[in-house]
């Protein structure tokens, strides 16, 4: 299918493939999350989010496209402290406006400016400076302590139990020409498609727990063709609400857009936020 009009291209996404013998995957093996192990390549059709901008919402679908003009310059995003002191406040206000939340605390970010993540297999480390191409959800329930609760503190977390979410914001620093972001609606991805991958430190303590995703033809994928710096994607990653829905965690990934492999490398900023209701 031609990609010049960017309407509904068919692309290949990197899903999870279970071990053939039924044994659980070793999530400490970074090749499983970032490399070629346990890899299932599947063709999916992408839907342009812009025409459905007013219909696709965080509440019902788990993602939302909003307009956001930042006061940050392009160069400012090279300064981690300025991102924390200025851009975090902008993101917090944008999420408040979109959700009606009482309070938003931004707690970490990734600026991606290379073609792929850097892996150090021997040290079990990854630098998140390139697109994450595996279909995933950032946080599984067992990972919430490491992801947010440890940072926010026991006193705060006890006071907001059942009233908080993790929401990510994502926007490009330049118009996206390659390796865009794709997000699947939460209701189209049932729980049985999620595979928990939990990593541990050498001392046995939990490092992170996230979901990888099995292919399912029911998944409904969206993207924003040639996404501009003033177009911000918000998407849910976890909810502590006991009545949480499928829209409270959405699968997402970067992907290769056929014909755009030699375009300018994508530069983007993603901020993760604790959202309190």
From Swiss-Prot:
Q: Which PANTHER family match?
A: BLL6449 PROTEIN, OXIDOREDUCTASE AN1597
Which UniProt keywords are present, listed alphabetically?
A: Oxidoreductase
Annotated protein name in UniProt: Alpha-ketoglutarate-dependent dioxygenase tstK
Q: Could you say which enzyme class this protein belongs to? A: oxidoreductase
Q: What is its EC number?
A: 1.-.-.-
The family annotation for this protein states: Belongs to the asaB hydroxylase/desaturase family.
Record's catalysed reaction(s): 2-[(1R,8S,14R,15R)-11-hydroxy-14,15-bis[(6E)-oct-6-en-1-yl]-3,5,9-trioxo-4,10-dioxatetracyclo[9.4.0.0(2,6).0(8,12)]pentadeca-2(6),12-dien-8-yl]acetate + 3 2-oxoglutarate + 3 O2 = phomoidride A + 3 succinate + 3 CO2 + H2O
* Industrial or biotech use: Phomoidrides A and B (also known as CP-225,917 and CP-263,114) are potent inhibitors of Ras farnesyltransferase and squalene synthase. CP-225,917 and CP-263,114 inhibit Ras farnesyl transferase from rat brain with IC(50) values of 6 uM and 20 uoM, respectively. CP-225,917 inhibits squalene synthase with an IC(50) value of 43 uM and CP-263,114 with an IC(50) of 160 uM.
Q: Which domain of life is it from?
A: Eukaryota
Its job = Alpha-ketoglutarate-dependent dioxygenase; part of the gene cluster that mediates the biosynthesis of the antihypercholesterolemic agents phomoidrides which are dimeric anhydrides. Within the pathway, tstK is responsible for the iterative oxidation necessary to convert prephomoidride to phomoidride A. The pathway begins with the highly reducing polyketide synthase tstiA that catalyzes the formation of a C12-fatty acyl-ACP, starting from one acetate and 5 malonate units. The hydrolase tstM is involved in the release of the C12-fatty acyl chain from phiA.
* Keyword Cell inner membrane assigned: no
Q: What is the lineage of its organism?
A: Eukaryota, Fungi, Dikarya, Ascomycota, Pezizomycotina
Q: Where is the signal peptide?
A: none
* One of the record's GO molecular function terms: oxidoreductase activity
């Amino acid at each position: 299918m031609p990609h010049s009009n960017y309407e509904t291209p068919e692309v290949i996404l990197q899903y999870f493939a279970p071990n053939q013998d039924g044994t659980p995957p070793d999530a400490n093996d970074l090749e499983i999350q970032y490399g070629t192990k346990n890899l299932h390549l599947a063709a999916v059709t992408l839907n342009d989010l812009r025409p459905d901008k007013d219909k696709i919402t965080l509440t019902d679908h788990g993602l939302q496209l909003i307009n956001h003009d930042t006061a940050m310059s392009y160069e400012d995003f090279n300064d981690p402290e300025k991102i924390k002191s200025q851009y975090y406040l902008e993101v917090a206000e944008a999420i408040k406006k979109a959700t009606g939340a009482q309070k938003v605390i931004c707690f970490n970010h990734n600026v991606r400016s290379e073609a792929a993540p850097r892996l150090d297999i021997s040290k079990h480390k990854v630098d998140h400076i390139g697109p994450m191409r595996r279909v995933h959800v950032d946080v599984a329930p067992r990972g919430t302590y490491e992801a947010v609760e440890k940072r926010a503190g026991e006193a705060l977390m006890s006071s907001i139990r059942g009233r908080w979410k993790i929401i990510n914001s994502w926007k490009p620093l330049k118009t996206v020409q390659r390796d865009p972001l794709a997000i699947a609606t939460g209701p189209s991805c049932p729980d049985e498609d999620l595979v928990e991958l939990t990593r541990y430190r050498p001392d046995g303590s939990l490092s992170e727990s996230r979901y990888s995703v099995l292919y399912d033809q029911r998944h409904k994928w969206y993207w924003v063709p040639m996404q501009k710096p003033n177009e911000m994607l918000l998407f849910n990653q976890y909810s502590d609400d006991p009545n949480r829905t499928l829209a409270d965690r959405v699968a997402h990934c970067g992907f290769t857009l056929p014909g755009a492999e030699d375009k300018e490398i994508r530069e983007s900023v993603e901020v993760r936020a604790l959202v309190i209701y």
